[in-house]
Curated annotation (Swiss-Prot):
One of its GO terms (biological process) is positive regulation of DNA-templated transcription. ATP binds at residues 549-556. Pfam families: THRAP3_BCLAF1 (PF15440). It is found in: Nucleus; Nucleus, Nucleoplasm; Nucleus speckle. The modification Phosphoserine is found at residues 220, 233, 238, 240, 243, 248, 253, 257, 315, 320, 326, 339, 379, 403, 405, 466, 532, 557, 559, 572, 616, 619, 669, 679, 681, 695, 860, 924, 935. It comes from Rattus norvegicus. GO terms for cellular component: exon-exon junction complex; mediator complex; nuclear speck; nucleoplasm; nucleus. It comes from the Eukaryota. This is Thyroid hormone receptor-associated protein 3. The modification Phosphothreonine is found at residues 324, 394, 870. The keyword ATP-binding applies. The modification N6-acetyllysine is found at residues 221, 346, 452, 468, 476, 516, 524, 555, 808. There is a cross-link at residues 202, 384, 448 (Glycyl lysine isopeptide (Lys-Gly) (interchain with G-Cter in SUMO1)).
Length: 951
């Protein structure tokens, strides 16, 4: 079916191109429509939700309901699913609809909420027949997804389908295609037969000119006037210009304009003449016969509540129907002729006649405009307004459709009738509510549909009338919102007419508001309206039109067209409305269109116009709030200059201050701890430490510090060595027993406890060693001097290389101390550090006790070196960067330390790793020094706390 329809629509679209541009325009639209036809068939066949038809039929079909479930879930079917289920753009990779209930985007269409367990289509198709599923899911999904094409499709098709959608839609589609191929009139009755249920009103309206249908007859009653007038006006002139066949469509075109505007595309038999009509005077007759016809059909069926309110309303539309048929037909002639015809199909046929008929129709359009204006301004503006509000969409769409297969026209006409009626009724309500502000949106909504039809015509018409309608660019842009850029010119024109006529249209819309009720009471209202209410409404709208004046006639015609056509349209519209899905879809689209059309119109106006229009609609509170906000901004801007600081700068400032304070604290704390941790020699050394902080930290090397401060450090450390060697040797022997170097890394981490204890002794050693090693390089070295004092007995001995009890530690330490002193210290120290501290001051006290003397001294050197060294390493690190020596020692120490400190105790973790690498990386010498001090402080604190405990 879809291929058949597609081929038909392809042929139709080619025909459409030959027959009218509207089809070619619709080739995208019509193509989506013919696809919609094919899709509706597909949906009937495969119950395809739009994305679903793309999914593999074999697995997606009920054949594998559970396989499909597997697809729902991540099963092996995932392979199938990926190609077929398109992930939603925003869904991420969630093939199973679990995260996105859409499965792969299209897996579960967003528009349908169905549990993942059963295929959205499948699960529903299981419960539903494809037909049912196709109408409502499709209208549901399509109304959501492609409001226009799919809404047109789904509503038109689904509404048509709802009554006799498949037979009618398919028959009307097929017949329309065939009828388009063959005489549409003959097949039109068959279509009417096929489409009798839903299309009966439409085809009646549609056949209104032919008086094929009851409504056609009813419409024909008003329409004879319309026909007479239409024939007299551009439509008649067009019809006169056109072949009699076209002329009869022209007669219909009044009727079509009024009632058949939608139908007439569907009575494509007449729109067939209407395409010939359109052919001869491409849109004059096609637009009057097809556009007007469509105006009637579209407005009639579509616009039961629409401007082409049924023939009866256009019995006064008698003026108006010709106005609509003629003027609108002329407008659409101009539009279609300008647009290249309602469609290329019409355009092709029409181009044969168009050059005659087009000019004629354009002339007639002008003539009709003049006539209609003479006739109360019920002319071109009126017809346009009748037609244009809808005809821009609908009427033009109708010639468009008239060119297109009647089947499509039917579907589309039904849909668009419903859509347009719904839109127009909605818009009429909203127009009445918002009157002028919203009327244009209504028109926009209608122009959206019309613009679809007219899109083809709009392009040429845009060319022709773009100059005219430039003022309608806002309307154009609404239509753009209607997604009908091509249709914009026509829509613009419609909007101009709508805008110009919008006031009249307001009255028309207000008159039309009941027709929203008609939507509810569609058949009854349509029947009544088609006979008596249409005259009443026709009188109302005619009075309104007459009151409105020439241009107002455009909108009055629009209103009347709506109202008159509302009567006719209400049947098919009621079919749609009778269907909750169609009604909801239409309402949804109408609301969306109205909202967006207003927005878009305002969006594309100049900011001042936009503001004015927006303000005009604002409540006083809104205006007041806006005023206050404006004042606040003004005052702030002019009277409260910002400091010019960015938030980043402001918070960075706070961070810097905090860092400085912390740095100061860290500097102080190591010193304080040193004093606390260290004996008088420590205080001496601490004084040295300050000096060292000043000079040695900058001096960069522990080795430098050692050598610089060695005299001092040795002096201080000698005393401490004497004191601490004994302590440290005792402690160290007990602690050295631990193979600190072997267990150093684990011990490093764990040894801070032991290190703390050991640090107590080491601090003495360190101070000695620091002095031996002259760790004047930094306060860290000083802090580590307290460690060094402990280590320094060892290190001093190492330096002294006296082979006393510390020889082992010296050897081990010295091996590393040499490098450390030489600048290789860092790594030796690292090992020592990790091992030394790690050797288990607290944690590895057992090991320390075992190997404590040699290892301890070694460890203490390393540890003392490393804690001490770590600060110095930082300092050396930083200073090495500064001094250049540090690069070697820094590389060996700082880096080694940086890597090693992690192995060390907590001290290394927080401080040494942080301070050597981090300080260097941060290139904050102060921070490095600070951290050195901190590390020294921590070491000393640990040592002090542990020293007493160790001692």
């Amino acid at each position: 079916m879809s291929k058949t329809n597609k081929s038909k629509s392809g042929s139709r679209s080619s025909r459409s191109r030959s027959a009218s541009r509207s089809r070619s325009r619709s080739f995208s639209k019509s193509r989506s429509r013919s696809r919609s036809v094919s899709r509706s068939r597909k949906r009937r066949l495969s119950s395809r939700s739009r994305s679903r038809s793309y999914s593999p039929a074999h697995n997606r079909e009920r054949n594998h309901p559970r396989v499909y479930q597997n697809r729902d879930f991540r099963g092996h079917n995932r392979g199938y699913r990926r190609p077929y289920y398109f992930r939603g753009r925003n869904r991420g990779f969630y093939p199973w609809g679990q995260y996105n209930r859409g499965g792969y985007g299209n897996y579960r269409s967003n528009w349908q909420n169905y549990r993942q367990a059963y295929s959205p289509r499948r699960g529903r198709s299981r419960s539903r027949s494809p037909k049912r599923r196709s109408p409502s899911p499709r209208s549901r999904s399509h109304s959501r997804n492609s409001d226009k094409s799919s809404s047109d499709r789904s509503r038109r098709s689904s509404s048509s389908r709802s009554s006799s959608n498949h037979s009618r839609v398919e028959s009307s589609k097929r017949k329309s295609t065939k009828e388009k191929k063959s005489s549409s009139k003959d097949s039109r009755p068959s279509q009417a037969a096929g489409d009798n249920q839903g299309d009966e009103a439409k085809e009646q309206t549609f056949s209104g000119g032919t008086s094929q249908d009851i409504k056609g007859s009813e419409s024909s009653k008003p329409w004879p006037d319309a026909t007479t007038y239409g024939t007299g006006s551009a439509s008649r002139a067009s019809v006169s210009d056109l072949s009699p066949r076209e002329r009869s469509p022209a007669l219909k075109s009044p009727l079509q304009s009024v009632v058949v505007r939608r139908r007439s595309p569907r009575p494509s038999p007449v729109p067939k003449p209407s395409p010939p009509l359109s052919n001869a005077s491409q849109m004059g007759s096609s637009m009057s016969g097809g556009a007007g016809y469509q105006s009637g059909a579209h407005q009639g069926p579509f616009d039961h509540g629409s401007g082409s309110l049924s023939p009866s309303k256009k019995s006064p539309v008698g003026k108006s129907p010709p106005a609509t048929g003629s003027a609108y037909g002329s407008s659409q002639k101009e539009e279609s002729a300008a647009s290249g015809g309602a469609a290329y199909t019409k355009r092709y046929l029409e181009e044969q006649k168009t050059e005659n008929g087009k000019d004629k129709e354009q002339k007639q359009t002008n003539t009709d405009k003049e006539k209609l204006k003479e006739k109360g301004g019920f002319s071109d503006a009126d017809v346009k307004m009748k037609s244009d509000p809808f005809a821009p969409k609908t009427d033009t769409e109708k010639p468009f459709r008239g060119s297109q297969s009647p089947k499509r026209y039917k579907l589309r006409d039904d849909f668009e009738k419903k859509m347009a009626d719904f839109h127009k009724e909605e818009m009429d309500e909203q127009d009445k509510d918002k009157c002028k502000g919203r009327k244009e949106p209504e028109f926009d909504d209608e122009p959206k549909f019309i613009s679809k039809v007219i899109a083809g015509a709009s392009k040429n018409q845009e060319e022709e009338k773009s100059g005219k309608w430039e003022s309608l660019h806002a309307g154009k842009e609404k239509q753009r919102k209607a997604e009908e850029l091509e249709e914009e010119p026509f829509t613009e024109r419609s909007r101009k007419e709508e805008r110009g006529g919008s006031k009249r249209s307001e009255s028309g819309h207000r008159g039309f508001v009941p027709e929203k009720n008609f939507r509810v009471t569609a058949y009854k209202a349509v029947q009544e309206k088609s006979s008596s209410p249409p005259p009443r409404k026709t009188s109302e709208s005619r009075d309104k039109l007459g009151n409105k004046g020439d241009f107002s006639s455009g909108k009055s015609s629009f209103s009347i067209t709506r109202e008159a056509q509302v009567n006719v349209r209400m049947d098919s519209f009621d079919e749609d409305l009778a269907r909750p899905s169609g009604l909801l879809a239409q309402e949804r689209k109408l609301c969306r269109d109205l909202v967006h059309s207003n927005k878009k119109e305002q969006e594309f106006r100049s900011i001042f116009q936009h503001i004015q229009s927006a303000q005009s609609q604002r409540s006083p509170s809104e205006l007041f709030a806006q005023h206050i906000v404006t004042i606040v901004h003004h005052v702030k801007e002019h009277h409260f200059g910002s400091s010019g600081m960015t938030l980043h700068e402001r918070f960075t400032k706070y961070l810097k201050r905090g860092n400085e304070q912390e740095a100061a604290k860290t500097k102080k704390s190591p010193e304080i701890h040193r004093r606390i941790d260290i004996s008088p020699s420590t205080f001496r050394k601490h004084g040295l430490t300050h000096e060292e902080l000043k000079s040695p930290r900058e001096p960069g090397y522990k080795a430098e510090g050692k050598y610089k401060d060695d005299p001092v450090d040795l002096r201080l450390d000698i005393e401490r060595r004497k004191k601490h060697k004994e302590r440290d040797l005792k402690r160290g022997k007990s602690r050295e027993s631990v193979d600190s170097r072997d267990s150093s890394h684990s011990r490093e981490r764990s040894t801070e406890k032991t290190e703390k204890t050991h640090k107590g002794s080491k601090k003495q050693k360190k101070h000695r060693r620091a002095r031996d090693r002259s760790r004047s390089s930094s306060s860290s070295s000083q802090s580590s001097h307290s460690y060094k004092a402990e280590e320094y007995p060892e290190e001093a001995e190492d330096r002294e290389e006296s082979t006393t009890g510390f020889d082992k530690s010296r050897l081990g330490t010295k091996d590393f101390v040499g490098p450390n002193e030489r600048g290789g210290r860092a790594r030796g120290t690292f090992q020592f550090r990790a091992r030394g501290r790690g050797w288990g001051r607290g944690n590895y006290s057992g090991n320390n006790n075992n190997n404590s003397n040699n290892d301890f001294q070694k460890r203490s050197r390393e540890e003392e070196w490393d804690p001490e060294y770590t600060p110095k390493s930082k300092k050396y690190y930083l200073h090495d960067d500064r001094e250049g020596e540090g690069s070697d020692k820094w590389m060996s120490r700082g880096r080694g330390r940086g890597a090693f400190p992690r192995g060390r105790g907590r001290f290394m973790f927080r401080k040494s790793s942080t301070s050597p690498k981090w300080a260097h990386d941060k290139f904050s010498g102060e921070e490095g020094e600070i951290e050195d001090d901190e590390s020294g402080t921590e070491n000393r604190e640990e040592k002090d706390s542990l020293q007493p405990s160790a001692e």
